Each structure stands twice: as C-alpha cells, then as structure tokens.
Swiss-Prot record:
GO cellular component terms, A-Z: large ribosomal subunit
PANTHER family for this protein: LARGE RIBOSOMAL SUBUNIT PROTEIN UL2M, RIBOSOMAL PROTEIN L2
Region annotation (Disordered) ranges: 222-274
GO BP, sorted A to Z: cytoplasmic translation
Protein family membership: Belongs to the universal ribosomal protein uL2 family.
Organism classification: Bacteria, Thermotogati, Thermotogota, Thermotogae, Thermotogales
Name under which the protein is recorded: Large ribosomal subunit protein uL2
Statement: the UniProt record of this protein carries the keyword Ribonucleoprotein: yes
Keyword Ribosomal protein listed: yes
Length: 274
C-alpha cells in the first residue's frame, strides 16, 4: 500500500494524493458476492431530503461482507485482495475448505495465500476471528461485535483498531478508536489486527470532480441562503445575527447533542472526551 503524487500540470494535480492500489490483486469482484445498490440522493422513502449534499456519483455494486465470521473451525485461504467502493478498507476474498466463498475486511499483513480461521481455537494472527474471552489482554483487534452473534460493528474503517485492555467476569474492557473505554460481552467476536489501507487518512482529493465521483455535492453555507432556507440566511452582508445554528435551529459550537439516556450508558467506563 502506497500513495501516488503527480507532476503539477494543474493546480488539482499539484495537490492530489491518491492510493497506488499496489495491494489490489483482482479487478472484478466475485459475482456470487455482489448485489445491486440503488442510490437514494439523500432522500428517505417519502422523497424528503434527510442527508443534505448527496447525489450523483459513480455507479456501485454492493459487496456482501462477512462481518459475523460465524463459519467456525473451517480454514479458509485468501485468494485475492480487492477494492471496495463502498468503504475505505480493502476486502479479502476467502475460499473455505468446503468451497464456500466469503469477503472479509482485509487487515494489515494479510496476503494472498495466507490461511485464516474463525473460532475459539484460532491462532492469534491477523485475519483470525475469536471470542474476546479467548484473546490475550493487550491484543489489537478490529471488526468488534457489541452483541454476540450480531456481527462486527466497531473498528471497520481503514487504519482503525481497538485494544483489549482487561477481562473481568462477563465483560471485556476495550479502548475504542475514539479513546473511549467500553465494556463488551466476552462472548462477542473480534478479528485480530488493524484494518488495512492505513494511508487512507493521507489521501487528498485534489479537485471538486473527484468528490462528485463519490456522490457528494457542494456544501452550501447558511449565510449564502435566504431566510426561508436557513437561520443564518438573509440580511445585509454576511452576518449571522445570532449564535451559529443548524438549518433546524439546533445550536452549533459546543452544544451537546447526544441522547440523554441510552441503555449502553452503563457500559461506558470513560467517555472519549474524559
């Protein structure tokens, strides 16, 4: 995995930093593991905009990823590392000993030809998935479940990971990518290692067109709108006239937006902001 820079033949080329895709070994996805992906343009089922500044972008097909890692005790061989347009991480195509094919998130250090295993008896090496109760304290993991059997929900983006800090009774203590310390049931599965494509954070789109290819539209400022469209709109000049707000009147700049009481609050040992 590396990054490409370009000769400054234009201002966009001067700034652009993109991956070199040297780790990709196969261009076309496995046909049995793809599904259609319909674009929403940021609209819900009523046709109303629920996420602003979304629309267009290159056509994609969804890759069906195995986040559950529930095929226990059967070894699988890595046959390819592939690009996935729906996520920042790369994905690895596995072929199990019984012939079944599945995609998983490709961790750092996983190469074509390697063998991976799911289950309590798996070795502690990148790509193997085990219950937290069978993983040594201090191990770096990703694709961590919150609810046993539901599938991994945490640390799935490029370069992210959690660290197993302690185990006590029914719960394991994990340090999240945000720095939060959180209890997770020891029966939950996690995959060993750090998610690959760690240089993703250093990529620079370089030009507006590359952002449009991803389906993101220009982010219009509130002060550039009319009063009917935004609390910051209208007026003479560019003044907001009052505290910064969202388009729906919720205060920005430090106002706490987290829901008051959540069932998982009792599992948070230390918040990410202390």
């Amino acid at each position: 995995m590396g990054l490409r820079r370009f000769k400054p033949t234009s201002p966009a080329r001067r700034q652009m930093i993109i991956p070199d895709f040297s780790e990709i070994t196969k261009k076309e996805p496995e046909k049995s593991l793809i599904a259609p992906l319909k674009k929403t343009g940021g609209r819900n089922s009523y046709g109303r905009v629920t996420v602003r500044f979304r629309g267009g972008g290159h056509k994609r097909r969804y890759r069906i990823i195995d986040f559950k890692r529930d095929k226990v005790g059967i070894p699988a061989r890595v046959v390819s590392i592939e690009y996935d347009p729906n996520r920042t991480a790369r994905i690895a195509l596995l072929v199990y000993a019984d012939g079944e094919k599945r995609y998983i998130l490709a961790p750092q250090g996983l190469n074509v030809g390697d063998t991976v295993l799911n289950g309590p008896d798996a070795e502690i090496k990148p790509g193997n998935a085990l219950p937290l109760e069978n993983i040594p304290v201090g191990t770096i993991v990703h694709n961590v479940e919150f609810i046993p059997g539901k599938g991994g929900q945490i640390a799935r983006s490029a370069g992210t990971s959690c660290q197993l800090m302690a185990k006590e009774g029914k719960y394991a203590l994990l340090r999240m990518p945000s720095g939060e310390l959180r209890k997770v049931p020891v029966k939950c599965y996690a995959t060993i290692g750090v998610v690959g494509n760690e240089d993703h954070k250093n990529e620079v789109d370089g030009k507006a067109g590359r952002v449009r290819w991803k389906g993101r539209k220009p982010h219009v400022r509130g002060v550039a709108m009319n009063p009917v469209d935004h609390p910051h709109g209208g007026g003479e000049g560019r003044g907001k006239g009052h505290h910064p707000q969202s388009p729906w009147g919720q205060l920005a700049k430090g106002y706490k937006t987290r829901r008051g009481k959540k069932a998982s609050d009792k599992l948070i040992v230390r918040r990410r902001n202390g």
